[in-house]
Structure formats: structure tokens, C-alpha cells
Amino acid sequence: MSEMRSTYVPPLQLTDGQPAPIAANGGVSYMSFERNGDAGTSVAIEDALKQIDSGVGQAVIDLIDNAPPGPIETKWGLGFRRYAECLDYIRANNIEAPEGGLAIPLRYSISEQPSYSVVSSNELWRDPQREEDAMRLRKDERDEVRRCLYFPQILRDARRIEEYHPGLSPYTAASMDKLGVSLAHCESECQNFYDHREVERVFYREMEELLLDFFPGATDALVYNHDVFDKHYQGDRTENQADKNPGVNANYANLVHNDLNDNSGRVRCRELLTKNLRNFGRQVNYTAAEVDEKMSRRFMSINLAKPMETVQQNPFVLCAWPSFADQPYINNYRIYDDRVGETTRFTYRPEHEWYWVPEQQPNEVSMLKCYDSVTDGSVSRWSFHTACINPNLPDDAPCRRNLVVRSFVFF
């Protein structure tokens, strides 16, 4: 890192034995390429446009569009353009799940190139001199969905993890250490999960206490923001960052992904601790030296999902770390005006070990790891996740209503 810069540049810290990510600059953060305090955003946009010009993204679309009807043979296995096609294949081939599980199509990217997303707040969208660039970038981002296919997978009941990993209870920190997935219980006192102020006042505190109780040796837990998911919500969905109001999401992320990676896990933690950036929770005020000391010890990013009612359609599904620990992740760059964030995608493997919580109850909390600072391979670095469609439910089954809170846990 360099303290002379206006922007913190994270050191690239790969897991021992992990292949290099599929990323620009060999995985080095774009914030290394700062120009006049822009945190590398100009170079990131230039690279996004160069990649569009190269045609590699269009080549993936052409491969799918020009393939004959039916299954598409990929290097990873048979993929399908549509959910229904993949489901028919699962049923025709008698692909079955164990008790409590579900055989299901899941949507993966088949593009082995980094992707770029210029966020809506970026000034590029309002610059008349860059209208042509904006059109190209918008089209390419929309085309990302055309670079995905459905693949058959099996979900296992996360409550029964001990059947698949003898001696490992899903209700323990050991499950998070090994798999990147755990379960917990919470009888929340929060009465209105659509009231962001009540959520931040009541539920954040409950989740921080849960995390400190759950992880032996944890010294601090900071819940910093949340999302609400409810397709059927009839009220105002508007997000208001200034008021710390996340709004209400009508859509569910139907693509295998993770929210953080080797770079962004450190960046997100540091910008919270030093700037309270996008922090909806309790405010913190650490000096740079104090943050360096805090981040020199182990810390993790954990997402916690709690339903408002029994989950039926669009359940949240989680993948266990050992089944993809040796697999390179693919970077997605989120370009703001003042920083370049990073999330990740993954290509399909039939060996991916997926879990869900069938009919997850309002007092059941599913937890997934988005980042762990331990890189020696002794613990999981992260999980990845997606929403999915349960084909065994009627068409009018209600969609998931839940909260997802994001946190950092420090040791």
C-alpha cells in the first residue's frame, strides 16, 4: 500500500495454492493506476472500452446464438439457454437429490473475461461528450446476461451438513471455517423490517451480538448495511443512500457470484473503518494506524440472511468452499467516480457443493462468508451464492421476503 496516494491500494493476497484470478492487470487493483486522484477509474473505463472493441464478449454471445437447438457443449459440461430446457434434461436423466435436497438448474457465466459495470452515479452517464461511450458500455453490460447458461446442480439441505461432513455441525464456527457456510437462530425484536431506522437500531445490534457469540475469539463485529428483498412489496421502493435507506429490491440475483474478492475485501473494510463509507450502522472513527493494526489480525466479511416469513420461491443458495477452492474467480469491476470495486463470478463445475435451507423459517439465519483475511489455506476464503427457482412450487408461490445484512468480524 502507499500512504502518499489519495486512495488506499490493497495488496493482492491470494490463497496459498490458489490459481491467479481471471482479472485485469494480473489481479492488481485498478486503484494502483490512479490519475489525479481518480482512484484508477479512468483506466478501468478505458480497459472496458478496449475489451468491447476486442470482440471477446461478442464471441461468447455468438457461440451461444450459433449453436444448434438443445444442449450446448461447453468445456465444463452441457449448458442450456433456458431454465426449462435444463429442467427437462434433469428430469429425463433422473438426476436426483438426497433427502431434503433439490435437483435444479443454476445460472453461471461462461465468459472467461473480466466484466465491467459503470454504476449509475458515475458522471460518465451525464457527460454529453461521452454519449457514444455510454451507449457502448450500457449495451455491453446488458449483454452479460447473454453470456450465461443454465447447468444442472444438486442442492443439499444445509441443516443436514453433518450427514455430508461427519462431526461438522452447520450451527458452528467450524462449519464457516471449513465450508464458508453456517446457520444460526435469532428471535428478533425488530417489528418492521421495512423501516430502515428500526432495522439499523434493533436488528443490526442483534446481528452483531449473534456474530460475537458465534465466533470464538471475535473481539468486534460491525454490521454496516442491509438489503430488503420483496418482489410483492406495494410501498415505496426508492433507495436513499444519504438517509441510509436501502429501499426494497424487487429482483433476486440469479447468477452465481460473490460480493467480494482478494482486493475488495480489504478495501471495503478499510473504507468503513477510516471513512464510514456507505456505513448504515454505528459510526466508527479509527486512525490509519489503528486500522492497520486492526487489519493486521484476522477479519472476515459475513453476510447474514433472515426471512420475514417462511421462504418459498427464489430461495437463497450457497456453495461450499472446498468444492471450488482451486478454481480461479473471474472479476467484475464496478466503476464509481472515486473508486473501482470488485465482485466475482465463477464458471460451472458439476462438483460444486451447493446448499439451501428448504422452507427457511423467520428465526433461521443463513450465513455465508464473502471474505477471510487468512490466506494460508487453513480456512475457507469465501462462499459464492445465487437465488434460484424451485420447480416444485406452483406458479403463484410467494417470492422470498427477507433481509440480508453485511458485516465484518474482527479477531
Residue spans of the language-model regions?
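Catalytic core of Fe(II)/2-oxoglutarate
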Residues: 342-411
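Non-heme Fe(II) oxygenase catalytic core, chiefly the N-lobe of the double-stranded beta-helix
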Residues: 3-43, 47-50, 58, 62-65, ...
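Generic low-polarity alpha-helical segments
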Residues: 1-4, 405
